[in-house]
Design a protein with these regions (language model features):
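Mature extracytoplasmic enzyme cores
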Residues: 1, 6-346, 358, 364, ...
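A general marker of short, structured functional hotspots
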Residues: 96, 375, 383, 398, ...
Length: 584
C-alpha cells in the first residue's frame, strides 16, 4: 500500500516570464497519489531563525518538500527510476556460519541484530543477513503476507539460494538535508546545488525564481557492468556488479529553455538513445502532450489559466480512440466487423458510434457528459474483451495480477487499443473463429452501451460520467473493519477526468469505475501575485473526523479552488487559525 501511496504520477507545467501576462514566472505542481483519508500530504508553514518556507510535506518530515521560500519555488514528479537491483545469491551453511559465493570464493554473510519496540509488548529482536550486495530478503519474504494478486513464493534461509537487494539507502542518505538546503536557497545556483544532494528519491524537480525556470532529474543512478536490472541477476559471477553512480552532471536538466516553458508528467523526457538509462517505466504521453498543447498556444498566461489547466479534463487518449473509430482505414475495418454482428448487438454498437462521433463528444471527460460515460465504459469493456479469455475471470490469480500490473506505468490496454493492430490477445480463445482488433472493438462498443444501460438507465440522454465514476474517500479503519463508515468516510462525489487527463481521476480499466488516484495536492506559485503561493491538499488537513478541517478541502478540490498561503508574518497571523510554537 505504501508503494502505491507514495510513488504514483504527477504533472509539472512551469512558465518563464515571457509566457505570463505579468512578466514573471509561474511554477505549478500537482502530485497524483492514491485517493486516501487521511491525506498523505499536509500543508505546512515553517519558520525558525535559519529557515522560512511554506508548502507541503509528509507528516513527520520537518522540512518542506514542495513549496516556496519567498525567492525560490519548486515542485516535483516521479521519474520511476530503475534504482534497485535484486541479486540471486548461492548460499550455504558450514557449522554455524552462513556463506555466499562470489567470484569462486565463499564469503561470510554479515549478520546484525535489529530491535523493534512495540507498544504494549516486549521488544522484538531479529537477525538481518547481508551480502556485499545488500540485505538478504529470504526471512522477510518468509513472514510477509502476500496478497493473492502477487503470489511471490517465500524463500527460506536454508535453501541454496538467497535474494539480496542493492539500494543506495543501505549506505546512508542525505536527501532530507538536501531538501532543507533547497528550502534555504536564495538563487537558482543554490537551488541546483541543494538538489544535487537528493540521492534516494528519483524526481523531476522543477524550480524557479521570478525571472528563471529550471528542471533537474535527481538521484544516484547505478552504473551497471552488465544488464539493466529489470530481472534478478546472478550474484556469484561478478558480471552484474554496480560500478559507482552516474555523476550529477550526466543527469537530464534544463534552464530557461527556448520554448519558455517546461513540462514533466512522468512521460519520457529524454530520447530513446539518451546515453543514461533512467527507467523502463515511462508513462504514456497523453497528459504531457495536452499540457504542451495548452502551453504552446499562448504567451500571456495568468494564474487563472494555470488553475484551469490543472483542472483540465480533455482526454488525448479519448481523441486517439475517436480517430480509430471514425477515420480512414480503421473506421472501415470497424464497420466491416460490425456488419457480422448479431442485429441486436450491432444496433447497440451503432448507437455507441453515434454518441462518440466528433460532433457529439468533444473528448472532455466532464462529470455530466454522456459521451464521457460511454468512453469510460468502452475502456472497461475493451480491457475485459481483450484479456479475460486468456487470463480467466475476476477471481483468477492471473486476472488479479493483470489488474494490479495495469495500475503501474505500462498499460496493456492502451497498447492494444491505440498503438498496435497485431496481437494474439485480440483472438477470443473461447470461440472457434479467429478475431482481430476490430472484431473485439465492435464487441466492446456493444458491451459498453449495454453496461451504461444497466448502470445508468435506458435513456442515454440522462447518462452522466459522474454517476458512474466517483470519488469516495474511505478511511483505512472503515475499509478494514467495516466500522464507523458514516463517521470516517466521505463521499461518493461525482468525478470527471480519467487517468489520461491533466486533472487525473484514475480508475482501473476492466475492474470498476472507482477513482483510486487523484491530485492529492495542487500548488501554484505565481511570482506576479503579492502572495504567490496557492495550494490545496485533498481531502483535509486534519486527521480527526470531528475537526472542521477533516474534509473542508473537498469542496475546493471539486470546484477547482485554491487556498492562498501567505509568507509575510502579519498576513500569516491573520490567515491561520492555529499556531504551534516550539521552544528549546
Amino acid at each position: 500500500t505504501l508503494w502505491h501511496t507514495l510513488s504514483l504520477h504527477d504533472a509539472l507545467p512551469i512558465f518563464a516570464p515571457s509566457k505570463t501576462k505579468g512578466g514573471q514566472s509561474i511554477i505549478a505542481n500537482d502530485t497524483h497519489l492514491m485517493l486516501a483519508l487521511p491525506s498523505p500530504w499536509i500543508i505546512m508553514h515553517l519558520e525558525c531563525p535559519t529557515y522560512r518556507c511554506a508548502g507541503v510535506t509528509l507528516p513527520g518530515i520537518p522540512v518542506i518538500t514542495a513549496g516556496f521560500n519567498g525567492t525560490i519555488a519548486w515542485g516535483e514528479t516521479m521519474v520511476m527510476a530503475d534504482s534497485q537491483d535484486l541479486f540471486i545469491e548461492k548460499i550455504k551453511r558450514e557449522n554455524d556460519n552462513l556463506l555466499y559465493l562470489f567470484k569462486g570464493k565463499w564469503l561470510q554473510v554479515k549478520t546484525r541484530q535489529e530491535t523493534f519496540k512495540i507498544k504494549g509488548e516486549d521488544p522484538v529482536t531479529i537477525p538481518v543477513f547481508s551480502t556485499h550486495h545488500g540485505p538478504l530478503l529470504n526471512s522477510a519474504l518468509q513472514h510477509l503476507p502476500m496478497p493473492p494478486e502477487m503470489p511471490v513464493q517465500p524463500l527460506p534461509v536454508n535453501i541454496p539460494y538467497g535474494l539480496s537487494l542493492s539500494w543506495i539507502v543501505k549506505d546512508g542518505d542525505v536527501t532530507l538535508d538536501a531538501f532543507y538546503r533547497l528550502g534555504r536557497a536564495r538563487s537558482m545556483k543554490q537551488a541546483r546545488d541543494a538538489i544535487s544532494g537528493i540521492h534516494s528519491i528519483y524526481l523531476n524537480i522543477v524550480y524557479g525564481d521570478s525571472q528563471n525556470i529550471g528542471w533537474q532529474v535527481t538521484g544516484l543512478y547505478p552504473v551497471r557492468k552488465k544488464g539493466t536490472g529489470q530481472f534478478p541477476s546472478p550474484g556469484w559471477t561478478g558480471e552484474y556488479e554496480w560500478d559507482g553512480f552516474l555523476p550529477f552532471s550526466a543527469l537530464p536538466h534544463s534552464k530557461n529553455p527556448a520554448s519558455q516553458y517546461l513540462c514533466t508528467a512522468n512521460h519520457r523526457t529524454v530520447g530513446k538513445n539518451y546515453p543514461v538509462h533512467l527507467t523502463s517505466s515511462w508513462y504514456n504521453q497523453e497528459r504531457a502532450r495536452r499540457i504542451d498543447q495548452v502551453l504552446s498556444g499562448k504567451d500571456d498566461f495568468t494564474i487563472e489559466d494555470v488553475m484551469n489547466l490543472q483542472n483540465d479534463r480533455y482526454s488525448m487518449m479519448a481523441k486517439k480512440v475517436q480517430d480509430i473509430l471514425y477515420h480512414g482505414r480503421t473506421g472501415k475495418l470497424l464497420r466491416k466487423a460490425m456488419d457480422s454482428m448479431k442485429p441486436s448487438h450491432r444496433e447497440y454498437a451503432e448507437k455507441a458510434l453515434r454518441m462518440l462521433q466528433p460532433g457529439s463528444f468533444n473528448c472532455i471527460m466532464d462529470t455530466g457528459s454522456a459521451g464521457a460515460a460511454l468512453m469510460g465504459a468502452l475502456y472497461h469493456s475493451f480491457t475485459r474483451a481483450a484479456f479475460m479469455d486468456e487470463l480467466g475471470k475476476e477471481d483468477s490469480i492471473q486476472w488479479e495480477s493483470f489488474i494490479q500490473a495495469s495500475m503501474t506505468s505500462f498499460s496493456a490496454t492502451d497498447q492494444l487499443l491505440v498503438y498496435t493492430d497485431n496481437s494474439t490477445f485480440y483472438d477470443d480463445i473461447s470461440t472457434p473463429e479467429v478475431e482481430n482488433k476490430y472484431d473485439i472493438l465492435a464487441r466492446s462498443l456493444y458491451q459498453a452501451w449495454n453496461l451504461c444501460r444497466e448502470e445508468l438507465g435506458n435513456d442515454e440522454n440522462e447518462w452522466e460520467w459522474g454517476a458512474l465514476h466517483t470519488y469516495h474517500w474511505q478511511h483505512d479503519i472503515a475499509k478494514k473493519t467495516g466500522l464507523l463508515k458514516g463517521y470516517l468516510n466521505r463521499g461518493p462525489f461525482p468525478a470527471g477526468g480519467d487517468v489520461h487527463t491533466v486533472n487525473v481521476a484514475g480508475f482501473t480499466w476492466g475492474k470498476n469505475f472507482d477513482v483510486w488516484m487523484i491530485p492529492a495536492m495542487r500548488m501554484i506559485v505565481d511570482f506576479n501575485s503579492s502572495e504567490p503561493l496557492h495550494i490545496i491538499t485533498t481531502p483535509e488537513e486534519s486527521g480527526h473526523p470531528s475537526s472542521p478541517h477533516y474534509d473542508d478541502m473537498i469542496p475546493f478540490f471539486l470546484e477547482g479552488r485554491y487556498q492562498e498561503i501567505p509568507l509575510g508574518s502579519e498576513s500569516s497571523n491573520r490567515h491561520y487559525t492555529f499556531t504551534m510554537i516550539l521552544t528549546p
